[in-house]
Every structure is written in C-alpha cells, then in structure tokens.
Amino acid sequence: MTTIVSVRRNNKVVIAGDGQVSLGNTVMKGNARKVRRLYNNKVLAGFAGGTADAFTLFERFESKLQMHQGHLTKAAVELAKDWRSDRALRKLEALLAVADETASLIITGNGDVVQPENDLIAIGSGGAYAQAAATALLENTDLDAREIAEKALNIAGDICVFTNHHHTVEELDSTTEPETPAA
C-alpha cells in the first residue's frame, strides 16, 4: 500500500505521500506520484490503495470538482454517492485524502466522506504511524505543516515495509486553522 499524510497549520495545508508501489511483498516501483494538484492547482489529493483504482477515482473526483466549480465538500459527497451506487466504482479499493484552502477530507472506499479531527489525515498502510507522529509534532513543536508531514512520513517509512522515503509533497495556502482540542 502506501502512506499519505495531510497537515494544516499556520495558514498552510500540505498533502504528502511516499512513492512505493508494491505487488504482494515485492517493491515494483519506488518513485510513484500519489499526490496531485487538481482543479487549477486549487485542490490537493493523495491516494492509498490500488494504483489503477486511484487514477479512476482521481478522474472522477476532478470531474466532480469541475461540475461543482471547485467546491470540495460538494464534489466529495457527489463522488461518494457515485462510489456507493455505481457497480464498477464499488469494486475500487482506494482511499483519497483531499484538501483545499478551507477543508480537509477523507473519501473512503465505502463511500464515506470524513472531515478529520484537527484537519490531520493519515491513510494507507503506514497511516497509523504517520498519524501518531504528526499528532505528537503538532502538539509539542512549532514545526510548519510541511515539516510535520515530512517527518511523519519518515517515521512511517522507518516502520512500515510498504512505505518508502521517496516523498511527493504539495502545499497550498490555507484560510482556516484547525480547532485546538480542549484539555
């Protein structure tokens, strides 16, 4: 699989991912681009799961963004509806992490759209490691979003055999800050 992480901090949002493509227990490619810019570079998207499935979802998601003039949440919900109702899409095995200047969302293979706590997303085989690392860095450092995403991916890559250290990082200016959790 892979690891994708998204962090929002100090008016920046980042989605970063590793580049490993595995077939069973064999590394087939180490420099795949699993993070992309969509809709006139205003939306970031990263995928975890089957590569062909993810490209199909990228195309569908981008068409939904076009249809809804770049409205991220509306496009995500419409894609999720299609994913649930379309027999061909239902068989796709992938997760999407998407973000624009105001929102960060996870679109699941079950057709769910989730807005994560604190605008922190970590998906894929190394997602739990990346999420734990990013959470600790968000709570205990002043690092920026890009540094946190890169460090979280490095930690996931050190632990998860399906995650490597070849990263693609995309960044946008953000107009919102995640809520600080109550003590």
From Swiss-Prot:
GO molecular function list: metal ion binding; threonine-type endopeptidase activity
Active site: 2
SUPFAM superfamilies: N-terminal nucleophile aminohydrolases (Ntn hydrolases)
InterPro entries in the cross-refs: ATP-dep_Prtase_HsIV_su, Ntn_hydrolases_N, Proteasome_sua/b, Proteasome_suB-type
Reaction it catalyzes: ATP-dependent cleavage of peptide bonds with broad specificity
Entry-linked PROSITE patterns: PROTEASOME_BETA_2
Localization annotation: Cytoplasm
Domain of life: Bacteria
Keywords per UniProt: Allosteric enzyme, Cytoplasm, Hydrolase, Metal-binding, Protease, Sodium, Threonine protease
One Pfam family, short name: Proteasome
Main localization category: cytoplasm
GO cellular component terms listed in the entry, alphabetical order: HslUV protease complex; proteasome core complex
Role, per record: Protease subunit of a proteasome-like degradation complex believed to be a general protein degrading machinery.
Family of this protein: Belongs to the peptidase T1B family. HslV subfamily.
NCBIfam families: ATP_dep_HslV, PRK05456.1
Name of the molecule in the record: ATP-dependent protease subunit HslV
Gene: hslV
